[in-house]
Amino acid sequence: MKSVILKPKNLVLLGAGVTTTYYLYKFFSAPSVSKDEGDKFGFNAPDPAALARAAVKEKKERFVKPSDNVCPILILYGTEYGLSAEVAKKLEESINSKLEGFWARIIDMEEYEIIEFEKEQIVLIITSTYGDGVPPTTARPFFDYLEANRLNLSHIQFSVLALGDRSYPHYCAAGKTLDKQFEEMGAKRFRDRIEVDQEDWTCFDRYIDTVCGLVPTLGGVEKREGQDYLYEKAKLFALSQGKYNKKKPYSSKLLVKRVLTKGDKVGIHLEFELGDSELKYVPGDALAILPDNAASEVSAIISLLKLSPSFKVSTPGWHYQEGEQPNPSQITLTHILTKCFDIHNCKPELLQLLKDNVKNQQEKEKLTNLLAQGTGKSNTQLVEFLENHHLIDILKMFSSARPPIDDLLAQLAKLLPRYYSIASSMSENKLAVSLCVAVVKYDLHGSERVGIASTHMADRMNVGDRVSIFINNNPDFRLPEDPTTPILMVGPGTGIAPFVSFIQERKALGHTGENHLYFGCRRSDEDFLYSKELQQYHNDGLIKLYTAFSRETSQKVYVQNRLLENSQQICDLINAGGHIYICGDAKSMAPQVHETLSLIITKHMSIDEADAQALLHKLEKEKRYQKDVWF
């Protein structure tokens, strides 16, 4: 099974694998600053006891009814990177602000055990599709539950909003599955399933408006008195969660930082302590890093806004809890722009807000032109503009627009965690977790720009500094259970990271299955990541290492060439029950390796191409052929 990943346009990882696709907003960090700096940013609350009481109140308010006699609505979302959650939150807010007599409650599918469907009447489902057409990782137990338990949902009226990406196979598959399952269990669809390609807020808003228009017309629903059953069940569920997780990340100390490469592209190895976090991972998982925006860029933005850095704004309800104490109700403008919002990836709605507030006629005409074809993905001019302009560029370009700061912040995307494949094994070291990261720097509109997370770690963190982390499980990229099973790993360039973890794990546990590793890069003396370690593993007989250096000879050599040179060996590995893993570029490398494998099978197993493709598909279904790839 493959996990296909879209990279944010300005983020390149040497830690291969899981990275962000959409604008995730609910993952949280403790401040990577000292107490004094925390006071400067407004992190440290003057009255911890009062804040603790406020936190308890806030948690209770999640399922406290606004009035005693309302019709409850369940909004159920499944998300991998947060977009479904963001849409679900907006739908919840729209229903609760516009529809009198109705009350929307929002639940992540990972909390499905607290739901009593026999007590629900209207269910609105929002889910993304991950990887090779599978549900989001944390939503999978819910999908399995529905498959194993044929519920009677004949009393429920429902609608599904399916999120996907047309560039991948199995478009919106998870949403289609839930739509079909609810129908088969007797639920009545009051709005046909809507499928949305990527982050198209025009479509999202249209769906929200449609639902808000249809819900009051539904028959057969009744208002409910008394406390909602979810009130107590949600509190019990919260108590069952681990000490640290994506909703309360661990503030980890940087232990080691060293450069892995030479030349113009810099790659670094990082090690973070796990301490008493109780965080656990297995090879194939990713580490999420919650970065800060660069202080210089934040200062420049505040200067353009003509506001004080210490200007107080409301703390976003989704903002992560910083440390053991709850967040204060207000934080500084510096804090919110440093920790909360993505100042590189701007949304179309920001331009609409500026257009509504702009004073200069030329600026207004430019904004009008950009928005002439709407704010959806079909407006290619707008999409291209936003891809090439950060918040600082936009504020400079439309300097006469001065919308209220709260309105401007409301149109910014949330700052995402960055995901890096883990390059270590807990079987070898339980006290730390390792990554390798490419330091991203590039030119845009005459100024040097940097990747948010990579430069946060490379340039702004020293050994001893802290950053917030959590583990992101990747169940579709796992070592075989049988320690004698041979494995084939193809990880050119950035794809090496999880295979370092694989090798360390098999070594520590004494696995006897053969380990074949194919690695490729430009030059052996510039970007051969972990070259000494891999060559030592090879010399010790732990792995069989095959390298391809594309720029060392006049004829470029890639991992595909090395695979072809060892065709019979690869067929023997498949016939022996071996597992195949590919990690790296999804646009060219992974498809080319797939076709190379098909060619090898066709030639050496004496079958035609269709049968070779069918065999590879069978291996995928059996989880003997797994991909962790990204664009």
Swiss-Prot record:
One of its GO terms (cellular component) is cytosol. One of its GO terms (biological process) is sorocarp development. Residues 73-212 form the Flavodoxin-like domain. FMN binds at residues 79-83, 160-191. It is an enzyme of class 1 (oxidoreductase). Binds 1 FAD per subunit. Its cofactor is FAD; FMN. GO terms for molecular function: flavin adenine dinucleotide binding; FMN binding; NADP binding; NADPH-hemoprotein reductase activity; oxidoreductase activity. It comes from the Eukaryota. Keywords: Developmental protein, FAD, Flavoprotein, FMN, NADP, Oxidoreductase. Residues 247-480 form the FAD-binding FR-type domain. FAD binds at residues 249-299. Its EC number is 1.6.-.-. Disruption phenotype: Cells develop only to the mound stage and accumulate a bright yellow pigment. Pfam families: FAD_binding_1, Flavodoxin_1, NAD_binding_1. CDD domains: SiR. Probable NADPH oxidoreductase that controls development beyond the mound stage. This is NADPH oxidoreductase A. The lineage of its organism: Eukaryota, Amoebozoa, Evosea, Eumycetozoa, Dictyostelia.
